[in-house]
A protein has these predicted regions:
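Hydrophobic face of amphipathic alpha-helices that form TPR/SEL1-like repeat modules
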Residues: 1-26, 51, 352
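A short acidic/small-residue loop/turn micro-motif
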Residues: 12-14, 18-19, 35-39, 261
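A structural signal for short, well-ordered beta-strand elements
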Residues: 20, 34, 58, 91, ...
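Residue-level signal for inorganic ion chemistry
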Residues: 27, 65, 87, 109, ...
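Conserved C-terminal structural/oligomerization subdomain of aldehyde/semialdehyde dehydrogenase
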Residues: 28-32, 219, 256, 310, ...
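Glycine-rich loop-to-alpha-helix module at the N-terminal edge of alpha/beta enzyme cores
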Residues: 31-119
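Rossmann-like NAD(P) dinucleotide-binding subdomain of oxidoreductase/dehydrogenase enzymes
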Residues: 121-265, 394
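ALDH superfamily catalytic-core signature
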Residues: 229-374, 437, 484-488
Length: 488
């Protein structure tokens, strides 16, 4: 069956190109999918434009749109097993992680399905008799949604659900490495009753399939989650038509541990913060900042436990984390570790490719801890996006804040302390979109997600996540019109 979904039809690529998708855990062939080029994407944009300008979707009521999203949530639950398996095959992540993701994805559709019916505008009190003044919400238009490979369907849901809730039409381009759950989602949207052209899917690499999404005049908004350099290029491309842009560009996230923290919990969560999904998480706590008096004991325990983490494929029930996404990405991570060692970091564990049965064929890299790091090191400043933990020391609150904020990113981070006042002070001073106190990684669809500084702008999830895909319009109606006689 063809894999591009354009104007309500499944079709192959115009130039008949295809791409093999292989599991990063063992190199096995997952499938062969159609590979879109620029012509396919332009056709998808045209379909989305027609559907927005002439089709029924933007003119449906909020309740109708919400009902469709709730139907999609039910279909996601129905197909959970197939979706989780497909996600794990494409990404290499453990099946249990993918299963959790599908639950979160269904909840995301439910949240926006319910929110849109309650967010319908407001009456404005003008203080003037004879005036009816209202602010109403309207869709932005045609939205280009570009999603990454680390959480393919989850990141897609964060964009598709609010975009549809607001009444937009869209063209979705997932990562070329992890397309299968996006294909499945478009089938579910069609099954739920989404009109032709309202949702379109193109597969392929950014320079070919993705390029028209940034500069095409018929695209009204681009929402992108991915790397900083690609985000910068998209901003530049979008500037020619002054289209709306929302960007989530990752982070280099601090995990700050004070000496008065709950030791066992802080150690446990420091491991989860950075080694979950082999560190391929935009909010990964890759920078461990430890109060100097606690440093030796804390880092020794982190190293002991990190050294025991078992690597394995998505269906290995004994595995605790999986492979990196590709050979090229593993080489990038290795280069950052090598650079860190050159700059003076101390290797405490990991740092070399593992070998053995079940590992040689995949893109595995072990949990790695680099101690005695300095703030200026590339491995501390840049997003390596792998299972690499850098460790820095601090002695005062002010120093902890300075180190935590000493990066171009500002996505997320955590503070570990038993002192509530101290936690509140740090949360207020950290330039981060999310601050966890005595926890790491949880999120809910009701609360906004996004970053400060070069982690991007715009928000996903929460009421602001819906607002990203809306325009506001003020309607002023004079109920008793009369001449002003301003001019004679």
């Amino acid at each position: 069956m063809p894999d591009l979904f354009i104007d309500g039809e499944w079709r192959g690529a115009v130039d008949e190109r295809t791409r093999e998708i292989r599991c990063p855990a063992d190199g096995s062939l997952v499938g062969v999918v159609d590979e879109a080029g620029g012509k396919d994407t332009v056709e998808a944009i045209a379909a989305a434009r027609r559907a927005f300008d002439e089709g029924p979707w933007p003119r449906t009521s909020p309740n109708e749109r919400g009902d469709l999203l709730l139907r999609v949530a039910d279909l996601l639950v129905r197909d959970k097993d197939a979706l989780a398996r497909a996600e794990s095959l494409d990404t290499g992540k453990r099946l249990v992680e993918s299963e959790y993701d599908i639950d979160d994805i269904a909840n995301c559709f439910r949240y926006f399905g319910r929110l849109v019916a309650s967010e319908t505008g407001r009456v404005v009190d003008t203080g003037t008799a004879g005036v009816d003044s209202r602010v109403v919400y309207e869709p932005v238009g045609v939205c280009a949604l570009i999603t990454p490979w680390n959480y393919p369907l989850l990141q897609t849901a964060w964009k598709v659900a609010p975009a549809l809730a607001a009444g937009n039409t869209f063209v979705l381009k997932p990562s070329e490495l992890t397309p299968h759950t996006a294909i499945h989602l478009l089938r579910l949207l069609a099954e739920a009753g989404l009109p032709p052209g309202a949702g379109n899917l193109v597969l392929g690499a950014g320079p070919e399939a993705g390029a028209p999404l940034g500069d095409h005049p018929d695209v009204d908004m681009v929402s992108f989650t991915g790397g900083l350099q690609t985000g910068r290029r998209l901003m530049a491309a979008a500037s020619g038509t002054v289209k709306k842009v929302a960007l989530e560009l990752g982070g280099k996230n601090p995990n700050i541990v004070f000496a008065d923290a709950d030791f066992e919990t802080a150690v446990d969560m420091a491991l989860t913060a950075v080694f979950l999904h082999s560190g391929q998480v935009c909010s990964a706590g890759a920078r461990l900042l430890v109060e100097d008096s606690l440093h030796d004991r804390f880092v020794d325990e982190v190293v002991r436990r990190a050294s025991a983490i078992r690597l394995g494929g998505p269906f290995d029930e004994r595995a605790q984390t999986g492979p990196l996404i590709s050979a090229a990405h593993r080489e990038k991570v290795e280069a950052y570790v090598a650079k860190g060692l050159e700059e003076g970091a101390v290797l405490r564990c990991g740092g070399a490719r593992p070998s053995g049965p079940g590992l040689d064929e995949g893109f595995y890299y072990p949990p790695t801890v680099l101690d005695e790091c300095a703030a200026g090191m590339a491995v501390v400043q840049d997003e390596s996006f792998g299972p690499v933990l850098t460790v820095e020391r601090f002695t005062t609150e002010d120093e902890a804040v300075r180190l935590a904020n000493d990066t171009i990113y500002g996505l997320a981070g955590a503070v570990w302390t038993s002192d509530e006042a101290k936690a509140a002070r740090l949360a207020a001073r950290l330039r981060l979109g999310t601050v966890w106190i005595n926890d790491y990684h949880p999120y809910v669809p009701q609360a906004e997600w996004g970053g400060f500084k070069q982690s991007g702008f715009g928000r996903e999830l929460g009421p602001s996540g819906l607002a990203e895909y809306r325009e506001t319009k003020h309607i002023w109606r004079n109920t008793a019109p009369a001449p002003q006689e301003w001019f004679a």
